A protein has these predicted regions:
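Bacterial Sec-dependent N-terminal signal peptides
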Residues: 1-22
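The right-handed parallel beta-helix/beta-solenoid scaffold, focusing on the short coil/turn
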Residues: 23, 57, 96, 104-106, ...
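Acidic Gly/Asp/Thr-rich repetitive segments characteristic of extracellular carbohydrate-active
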Residues: 27-60
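Extracellular beta-strand-rich solenoid/capping regions of secreted or surface-exposed proteins
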Residues: 45-49, 67-107, 116-135, 143-160, ...
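Short glycine/acidic-rich loop motifs that flank beta-strands on beta-rich extracellular proteins
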Residues: 56, 117-123, 143-148, 247-249, ...
């Protein structure tokens, strides 16, 4: 133990001396080198702390592999939007490989290094940081949280599968059990991939296999005595993972001016890269997809990018998103329901979705809107003067003026208008997801341009705004969808199975008072399988112009291209 402490002290001293001599620090000079295959969590923890203390501007890694285990990693408690309920995962502790804590003007230059994680970990967190760049890095897990099984053959006695070499399993009491480094999969979600069609879809295949007698026929091969009526498609692959979002891929928390550039993110456990109440986030050439040569199909247990309560500008440029079990991009705020008046100018507000609660949703000085849940109309505004946390689910907020008389308790909501971003998503590629491609709800300017959406199971672009389900705010006012290509999207579901869906949660639909406004869909190319190109509800000033629509072979006949409900003054022009 004494030797370990001396080594740690030496590392800190070396790092501090080097950092004071130059703005650039080389990890190798501090004894951190690739391909040792030892646990570097503690060394990186101490090195980053030393960089902060010394004011180091650039940390440089040699190219190669660096390994991180939970032991020695930083542990922090955070409530993170859209992760786990109190019942699913009472602990909010995250185990962090690289923690940037209150750092400013700092760059990690990876030179193509691969950071390999073990167990269940949050790979990177930036907590209350400014002006941070992560560049030229790859992130992966030795044993990803997702397992992959490919149907090899079937006969009258059952089915044989091949498990991917990164998937760990054991036959226990005649049944298959999936496990990893310090964990096992119990509550399973299964998505199936068909390589012939390129489609990714919900499947009951795992439930059948897990309940069937199993025998290992060779390393990595298992035979199941499945029911006679089970007829899987040979060559398809099941991707299965635990539903509990107890960690995230990365967490950017109340930080500003963060750049992720030239990254390969090859697996994320739980949720993906979550930016929460942060400002000015840019991702440029970030590839969220399986590592080249890995032979894997899955790269995230859920979303790839999740932006909750962010502001400034969110920019996603030249990225690739391949192999998510949920939405590649989701940008939204959080509506809190008004549950009690505590004074003339104060309310108790409650988080309404079990998986989104406990985080700071309002700050003094923020402008808010009061929202009618039935119509999703913003009907009054105020400024926050103070916030008091009453519990993990309830906060008391005091405003600079009386609460509007028309507010209905236990029904209407409060939306934070300050914590809403402009959004630019450009030159990106989306495929191999069973859900949507991009979800966005913000009142500020949105540009979605020059992207390719290929075979998203549900709507390629979904604009909701709700006070009923996830309580993800709110009405959009300026959206341009231009020069994108949509290939066989929404073949499996979504609102009206439409490629682009504008679907607010309002139950009161009045064309004279639309929820969404000024959505322009211009110059795009659609290749569809007979499903609608556009579904729009309660949208004013909708423009659909100069788009090309092609029908794919084997398309379903007789479907409408457009489905409109309660829209005001739409302009629909087709070629």
């Amino acid at each position: 133990m004494r030797r370990i402490l001396l080594l740690a002290a030496s590392l800190l001293l070396t790092a501090g001396v080097q950092a004071r001599q130059t703005d650039t620090l080389f990890a190798a000079d501090c004894g951190i080198r690739p391909y040792t295959y030892e646990n570097l969590s503690g060394k990186f923890r101490d090195l980053l702390a030393a960089c902060k203390e010394a004011g180091t501007r650039v940390l440089v890694l040699e190219k190669g592999r660096y390994d991180f285990w939970p032991e020695g990693a930083v542990r922090r408690d955070w409530f993170i939007s859209n992760t786990s309920s109190e019942e699913e995962c009472p602990s909010k502790t995250k185990t962090v490989g690289l923690l940037l804590d209150g750092m400013e003007d700092f760059v990690i230059e990876g030179n193509g290094a691969t950071l390999m994680f073990h167990g269940k970990m949050t790979m990177v967190a930036a907590d209350r940081c400014r002006n941070i760049v992560l560049r030229n890095l790859h992130f992966d897990f030795e044993r990803p949280g997702g397992s992959e099984l490919t149907y090899l053959k079937q006969d009258e006695e059952g089915v044989e599968v091949a498990l991917h070499r990164d998937s760990r399993y054991e036959i226990v009491d005649g049944k298959i059990r999936l496990f990893g480094e310090g964990w096992q999969s119990e509550k399973i979600h299964c998505i199936e991939y068909d390589p012939d069609t390129g489609r990714f879809f919900y499947s009951d295949g795992w439930n059948v296999l897990a309940s069937s007698p199993a025998v290992e026929t060779a390393p990595g091969r298992v035979r199941f005595a499945t029911p006679p009526d089970f007829r899987p498609r040979i060559g398809n692959t099941l991707t299965v993972r635990d539903i509990i979002r107890d960690q995230v891929g990365m967490f950017l928390h109340q930080s500003e001016n963060i750049m992720l550039e030239d990254l390969g993110v090859h697996y994320m456990h739980g949720l993906g890269i979550v930016s929460q109440y942060s400002r000015d986030i840019t991702l440029r050439r970030v590839d969220c997809m399986p590592r080249e040569g890995s032979g894997r199909i899955l790269a995230s247990s859920a979303d790839f990018l999740h932006f909750s309560g962010c502001s400034g500008k969110v920019r996603v440029l030249g990225c690739r998103f391949i192999g998510a079990q949920d939405d590649p991009i989701n940008v939204h705020g959080t509506n809190l329901r008004a549950v009690a008046r505590t004074g003339e100018a104060s309310l108790q507000l409650r988080f309404m979705h079990a998986q989104s609660y406990g985080f700071d949703a309002f700050f003094p000085g923020d402008t808010v809107s009061f929202v009618k849940a039935a119509s999703m109309q913003r009907f009054a505004a105020a400024t926050v003067t103070s916030v008091r946390r009453l519990s993990d689910q309830v906060v008391e907020v005091v405003f600079d003026r009386p609460v509007p008389a028309g507010l209905e308790l236990d029904r209407d909501c409060v939306e934070n208008m300050t914590r809403t971003p402009e959004v630019e998503i450009r030159n990106c590629f989306f495929t191999r997801t069973s859900t949507r491609g991009t979800l966005v709800t913000t009142p500020r300017k949105v540009v979605i341009a020059d992207n390719v959406y290929c075979k998203t199971g549900m709507s390629a672009i979904l604009i909701e705004g709700d006070a009923e389900g996830w309580y993800e705010s709110g009405p959009v006012k300026d959206v341009l969808i231009r020069n994108n290509t949509f290939i066989d999207c929404a073949w499996n579901g979504g609102p009206a199975r439409a490629v682009i869906a504008l679907h607010p949660s309002n139950t009161l639909v009045d064309p004279e008072h639309p929820v969404h406004e000024n959505v322009r869909i211009i110059g795009n190319r659609f290749q569809v399988s007979g499903n609608p190109v556009l579904y729009a509800k309660s949208t004013g000033g909708l423009v659909f112009r100069d788009n090309t629509i092609e029908t794919l072979p084997d398309a379903l006949p007789g479907r409408d291209l457009f489905i409109l409900e309660g829209c005001k003054d739409p302009v629909l022009e087709t070629e």
